[in-house]
Amino acid sequence: MTMCSGARLALLVYGIIMHSSVSCSPAAGLSFPGIRPEDEAYDQDGNPLQDFYDWDPPGVGSPASALRDAYALYYPADRRDVAHEILNEAYRKVLDQLSARKYLQSVVARGAGENLGGSAVDDPAPLTKRHSDGIFTDSYSRYRKQMAVKKYLAAVLGKRYKQRVKNKGRRIAYL
C-alpha cells in the first residue's frame, strides 16, 4: 500500500465533508437523524431561536407550484392578459398569411385556377390559340390569371405587397 500525500488526504477529507453536508442538508429534504438537539436554543436576549429542522422553506412543494408562484409574481394577471391578446392577434395574422400563401401555391400549381370548379375531368386536348393572329395564347391567359390571383392575395395580405411594388426598381441589399 502506498502512502498518501498530505494534499491527497486533505482533499479526501474535504470531499467526504462536502458530500455529507450536501446530502444531509435541509434543502435536500433530509434531516440530521442523530444530531438533533432536544433543548431549545436561545439568542443573547433570551428569545427562542427558530427551529431549522422543522422549518419548511418556501418552494419545498412541487417544482410546478414554485414555477406558478414565480410566474404570478413577475407577470401580474392584467399584463399577462394584454400579452396574450397581442400574441393571439399576431398569431392570427401569421396564420392568415400562411393560409393565403398556401392557397396561392395551390392555385398556381393547378394551372392558375382553370379547374376551380373541382371537376375531376381534365381536358386532354392540347392548348390551342384563342385568336387567329396568334397573339393571345393559352399560356398568356394563364399568366394573366396568375397575376390577377397574386394581386388579389396581395390586397388581402395588405401592406407588404405595396412596399414590394414601390421598391421594385431598386433592390436593397441586407447585410
From Swiss-Prot:
Signal peptide positions (record): 1-24
Region (Important for receptor binding): 149-157
Propeptide: 25-78, 172-175
Keywords on record: Amidation, Cleavage on pair of basic residues, Hormone, Neurogenesis, Secreted, Signal
InterPro entries on file: Glucagon_GIP_secretin_VIP, VIP/GHRH-like
One example GO MF annotation: peptide hormone receptor binding
UniProt GO BP: adenylate cyclase-activating G protein-coupled receptor signaling pathway; adenylate cyclase-modulating G protein-coupled receptor signaling pathway; insulin secretion; negative regulation of cell cycle; neuron projection development; neuropeptide signaling pathway; positive regulation of chemokine (C-C motif) ligand 5 production; positive regulation of cold-induced thermogenesis
Chain's role: PACAP is a neuropeptide involved in diverse array of physiological processes through activating the PACAP subfamily of class B1 G protein-coupled receptors: VIP receptor 1 (VIPR1), VIP receptor 2 (VIPR2), and PACAP type I receptor (ADCYAP1R1). Exerts neuroprotective and general cytoprotective effects due to anti-apoptotic, anti-inflammatory, and antioxidant actions. Promotes neuron projection development through the RAPGEF2/Rap1/B-Raf/ERK pathway. In chromaffin cells, induces long-lasting increase of intracellular calcium concentrations and neuroendocrine secretion.
Subcellular location: Secreted
Family of this protein: Belongs to the glucagon family.
Gene null: resulting phenotype: Knockout mice show delayed recovery of axon regeneration after crush injury compared to wild-type mice. No difference in motor neuron survival after axotomy compared to wild-type mice.
Modified residues (Lysine amide): K168
Protein name: Pituitary adenylate cyclase-activating polypeptide
UniProt modified residues of type Leucine amide: L157
GO CC annotation terms, alphabetical: extracellular space
